[in-house]
Amino acid sequence: MLASLANNPVQIAFSLTLIGVFAAIYHPVGLAMVVQGRNKTGIPLAINGVFGNMGVACAALLTGFLIDVSGWRSAFIVPGVISILLGMYYQLFVRSSRQSDGGAPHSAVTAGKAEPAAVPRNTLLRVFTVIFFTTAVGGLIFQSTTFSLPKVFSEQFSGSATIIGWYSFLVFSVAALAQLVVGHLVDNYSIRPIFAAVALLQAALFFVMTKVSGTTTLIVAIAFMLAVFGQIPINDVLVGRVVRSEWRSRAYAIRYLVTFTVMASAVPLIAWVHGSWGFSRLFQLLAISASLIFVATLFLSNSERTVQH
């Protein structure tokens, strides 16, 4: 809500920085809470991811609506009020949960449940190398696709910014549901072939994207975004399987530090590639990136028996 009181760009930048600082708690703490005490974490993480991606998909539409109806300040006031109310509700929820558990903290109640078995150091190092490498490359792919897709549609279709926004909303909304499918698969089958298949599908569809135009662009975009969004829960499931609960928040924090660092660097990269060669070259680079993820998943072969429950 502080951002709604800003009167110049410096104040807005300061307010947005504070929003980022406090919102940063979500991934390290929120994801650790989602997987706490669970044997099968794919579906819970997928549901969490769907809500997150739907939030991203709706953000532009709702923000535009609030700005049109009440001005730009309302775009900060309304989310601020909702966040405060949710925080108050969560505090009441925590208190009632502790009372029902006899006053014991939630961590004490769930301690020892669904903890991963001891993992050899070499195996752990291999798995985390794969996690962080695929996180970095996957973050580049995710940011590149979500950031560039509206511009791709504006070049392929004639229409207002609102129409282009609806095209993007359609793609992101449908694609977010892929996480549920992948979440179910990783809960019931080996992660390695699923991860490899998702990466290979991305590479193939990115290559196809360089060859299509018109309405086919929308169809292929939905297809490759299904694969891009489908990858989201896989790394989080791997972290939950190999890291004990007391270290899980730190592991998620490092993973998302890598993700957001790469995502920030993706924006100037997209601008440079598009300005120099166009989107065809960008999708060629994304196809190569997805192929590198596929190669990385092959290194899970010797460790997967250990990380599976």
Model-derived features with residue positions:
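Interfacial helix-cap and linker-helix signal at transmembrane-aqueous boundaries
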Residues: 65-70, 153-154, 185-186, 270-277
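C-terminal ends and interior cores of transmembrane alpha-helices
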Residues: 1-7, 201-213
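Cytoplasmic helix-loop-helix junction between adjacent transmembrane helices
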Residues: 15-52
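A late C-terminal transmembrane helix in Major Facilitator Superfamily
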Residues: 242-277
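Flexible cytoplasmic inter-helical loops of multi-pass small-molecule transporters
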Residues: 92-117, 306-309
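Hydrophobic core of transmembrane alpha-helices in multi-pass small-molecule transporters
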Residues: 11-25, 136, 216-230
